[in-house]
Amino acid sequence: MKVKIKCWNGVATWLWVANDENCGICRMAFNGCCPDCKVPGDDCPLVWGQCSHCFHMHCILKWLNAQQVQQHCPMCRQEWKFKE
């Protein structure tokens, strides 16, 4: 018996791999997008700090820009440095 495929429709899903399920700043799911974005994906990436906490890029940038003196992680209060 031989099987011949006449038509194939692929379906895919994606998700960010992070320590948590939600952003610690906006509390939105990482599989969604931050409040500033309309659609999730590459335009709303996740960023990690050296402390290994993860946030939407737009959320942490707003947080850091709002701090006057030294920039700290909103979760553990360590000095914020982006993980490379």
UniProtKB/Swiss-Prot annotation:
This is Anaphase-promoting complex subunit 11. GO terms for biological process: anaphase-promoting complex-dependent catabolic process; cell division; positive regulation of mitotic metaphase/anaphase transition; protein branched polyubiquitination; protein K11-linked ubiquitination; protein K48-linked ubiquitination. InterPro entries: RING-box_E3_Ubiquitin_Ligase, RING-H2_APC11, Znf_RING, Znf_RING/FYVE/PHD. It comes from Mus musculus. The keyword GTP-binding does not apply. Auto-ubiquitinated. Together with the cullin protein ANAPC2, constitutes the catalytic component of the anaphase promoting complex/cyclosome (APC/C), a cell cycle-regulated E3 ubiquitin ligase that controls progression through mitosis and the G1 phase of the cell cycle. The APC/C complex acts by mediating ubiquitination and subsequent degradation of target proteins: it mainly mediates the formation of 'Lys-11'-linked polyubiquitin chains and, to a lower extent, the formation of 'Lys-48'- and 'Lys-63'-linked polyubiquitin chains. Belongs to the RING-box family. The RING-type zinc finger domain coordinates an additional third zinc ion. A zinc finger (RING-type) spans 34-77. It holds the Pfam family zf-ANAPC11. It is found in: Cytoplasm; Nucleus. GO terms for molecular function: cullin family protein binding; G protein-coupled receptor binding; ubiquitin protein ligase activity; ubiquitin-ubiquitin ligase activity; zinc ion binding.
